[in-house]
């Protein structure tokens, strides 16, 4: 068995604008955004890029970069692929993981740190990053032995005339039967499928969390007015998350359509290797879009209901204040027959304002202690 290369990949939704920002950083160690120059310079030094280039392609422009022991490609739709020539599998995997987590991720997180933040419901999403091994002329026993050395096992196998694909928990292994197949485009699609699926799963879990949060509000028989502010703030966070996911799902629809067109020549190979998922993921994306629209409608109706109740209560406070003011003025005018600075006049005015204040704040306390029925 000849082990050729080890791959690791990720996919984060990006655009050509983001790709140009990353290329500018590689080129200058700077950013056109208002970021700390010292930190940018430090991150650039830590990255230790040896060579890089901008590659214009038919579907996706790409930034290619070479580092000490590996190379990386970064496509404009956000797909990142790391490739390392095999030396020692354990060391190679650790090096790829260390580079991704300790050197590249801080760069990506910082140069794209401005703008809409990732909602807290999505902040804990863990990306699925299997190691992908490229080998030549291997058999099942050799693959089983290799997997067992690292505490993994073969879950399934798919065959095509050009290659066999072994699926494990930690590793995917491509056993190439000759030189007639380009492995990197298939690896890219495999990573795209897994990351796309992982994001949809994350959005599904976030939907469940948000729906439960809204349901807990709606399931209460009564709501206290004094709780409206905290509930409103919570719903505002929910609406922010809904807007974020709505935009992401719309982008995902476009990304998967372009990737499908890009991989047309690979369709038969992908199907034979049991990794063709364009139809399945497109259907899942459409379902998730409908699910989040329903969640958005649920959140909007709850928010609008609370807004109506809140405005009604505030209006009652305003009406009470108007009533107190009118009564105070009427009583004050009725005492104008008294000398302006006489003790009787001053005492009457003070008494009116004291009773008016007691009446108003009593009404205000009552309004703010109200409970509203939601059923």
Predicted regions and their residues:
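Hydrophobic, Leu/Ile/Phe/Ala-enriched alpha-helical segments that form helix-helix packing faces
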Residues: 11, 44-47, 51-53, 59, ...
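Membrane-associated alpha-helical segments
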Residues: 231-334
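Generic detector of short, locally flexible boundary/turn motifs and exposed helical patches
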Residues: 35-49, 136-142, 260-262, 295-296
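Extended alpha-helical interaction modules
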Residues: 64-233
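N-terminal pre-transmembrane cytosolic regions of membrane proteins
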Residues: 1-123, 366-368
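Alpha-helical transmembrane anchor segments
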Residues: 315-375
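Short linear motifs at secondary-structure transitions and domain/linker junctions
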Residues: 47-48, 54-60, 140-141, 147-152, ...
